[in-house]
């Protein structure tokens, strides 16, 4: 399996932010939004990212954050698609459904937007597990 061309990542960013009071994926750690840590980790590992958000305002916000970051840094080597939850306010399962409907590969790794310290080793473990299932 060529992991660069056969795996997508769905990042769930559609939470209501009731407990935090603000959108978690755009919250900054050391002046860098959490979503960017995840995208940096995924670079050179997958073919596409589908970011699932809950409204058009967040689509614009995330698009601006990511576009500005790529303008100031090396661009990501995967495509990024922004989609709105098909079923609003029903939790992460509706985000997963929306994400799976919008990937172009057979498999999608699902990550929450508030996991900035996800390691490449974890992604590799998931890819290797998938490869073993397909052997």
What are these regions (language model features)?
Residues 2-135:
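Nucleotide and nucleotide-moiety/phosphate-recognizing core
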